[in-house]
Amino acid sequence: MKKQSNIWLYFFGALGGALYGYDTGVISGAILFMKKELGLNAFTEGLVVSSLLVGAILGSGAAGKLTDRFGRKKAIMAAALLFCIGGLGVALAPNTGVMVLFRIILGLAVGTSTTIVPLYLSELAPKHKRGALSSLNQLMITVGILLSYIVNYIFADAEAWRWMLGLAAVPSLLLLIGILFMPESPRWLFTNGEESKAKKILEKLRGTKDIDQEIHDIKEAEKQDEGGLKELFDPWVRPALIAGLGLAFLQQFIGTNTIIYYAPKTFTNVGFGNSASILGTVGIGTVNVLMTLVAIKIIDKIGRKPLLLFGNAGMVISLIVLALVNLFFDNTPAASWTTVICLGVFIVVFAVSWGPVVWVMLPELFPLHVRGIGTGVSTLMLHVGTLIVSLTYPILMEAIGISYLFLIYAAIGIMAFLFVRFKVTETKGRSLEEIEQDLRDKNGQGGAAGKQQTVGT
């Protein structure tokens, strides 16, 4: 059986990541010009930025259960529709209240897509390519962020912040149309009794009719337990939950989204003008995309855990240097350029490690019967972390200064290194069913899923 090309399948599957990235990055430039027209003060500015995250928390909290009930495809379709409505709404918002409302709607889309897209890609991909294909989500996030920075720069002189925000509706319409032609996750179909349809999709995805072993492992995993929030806290599932929540929370508290959200302000603080600051973020966005491509190339060769540990070390060093430079050499040309270089190094190591790896691992860690809700709860924790960081950054900046803030993030990075070393298991080169069986065996659950040699998943 000739294998069909799945390039477009994975592209549209990951397009939700681009929308998340765009809406995350575009606000950093738009907020510089929005303040004057909408009359924002420090409080309402923080409200506009953080309202998306409030919606994301609500969206990711509901998405896991909804996708387990209605399917991955319908959930992505709902996210695309919300992205479109939210994008148009923020572009046309006449005042702060309406802006916050539609930012919350965008957040619902973000929460849904960040839960479902990694899960969907993970369930479609063969095991030997799962890391690379699941990393497409993070690649598209970085592409979305880069595009938002470019759009910000193009419209900066005209202060056309409404165009900056409104252009997000274009790719959301593309996703809404594209998802109509995408297959449902075969694993979800099996859990909902649509075996014949699931087999046909698997045959097309794998390019072979020899999928009996893969089907056997999916069936065995599916019939082990009923899935729900209660089952997520079963003793044998708990290590996966701890790892998922920890990775999601720590990814944000290393300070990554602080750099993304407030990169223009960071550049301004070290002496750059508004346009130069936005152009600087375009450079950071470009590095982010290029290094995520490197991650896609190496993640299935090197493994998830080594990349996380490497990333921790690199980010901690960058943050310490940033802190020392701004503490002892503030307001000098050397400090300004050293800051830019260190931000670049931080992005490089993040983009080949914690950026893609966390999104890849979240759906990998959880057993089939709680994969949707487990990924949803972990993603909820990720957005809670993002919200806390975005709200506390300006407060801490004013209270203790950027140098000590970077030192706090560095200390959290050291804790993250220890967490990965002792609490996170390697998932490279194993099928989802084999990962589940290993979790069962290590925690006295037993079961049949994945006991045989698994091929093709």
From Swiss-Prot:
Q: Which PROSITE patterns match?
A: MFS (PS50850), SUGAR_TRANSPORT_1 (PS00216), SUGAR_TRANSPORT_2 (PS00217)
Intracellular or extracellular location(s): Cell membrane
Quote a single Gene Ontology cellular component term.
membrane
Keywords of this entry: Cell membrane, Membrane, Transmembrane, Transmembrane helix, Transport
Q: Which Pfam families match?
A: Sugar_tr (PF00083)
Q: Which GO terms describe its biological process?
A: D-glucose transmembrane transport
Q: What is its main location?
A: membrane
Which GO-annotated molecular functions does the record name?
Answer: D-glucose transmembrane transporter activity
Question: What domain of life?
Answer: Bacteria
The protein's matches in InterPro entries, at most eight in alphabetical order, are given as: MFS_dom, MFS_sugar_transport-like, MFS_Sugar_Transporter, MFS_trans_sf, Sugar/inositol_transpt, Sugar_transporter_CS, XylE-like
* TM regions (residue ranges): 7-27, 38-58, 75-95, 97-117, 136-156, 163-183, 240-260, 276-296, 309-329, 340-360, 377-397, 400-420
Q: Which stretches of sequence are listed as region Disordered? A: 438-457
The record gives the membrane topology as: Multi-pass membrane protein
Alphabetical list of NCBIfam families matching this protein: SP
Family membership noted in the UniProt record: Belongs to the major facilitator superfamily. Sugar transporter (TC 2.A.1.1) family.
User: Entry's PANTHER family?
Assistant: D-XYLOSE-PROTON SYMPORTER-LIKE 2
Q: What is this protein called?
A: Putative metabolite transport protein YwtG
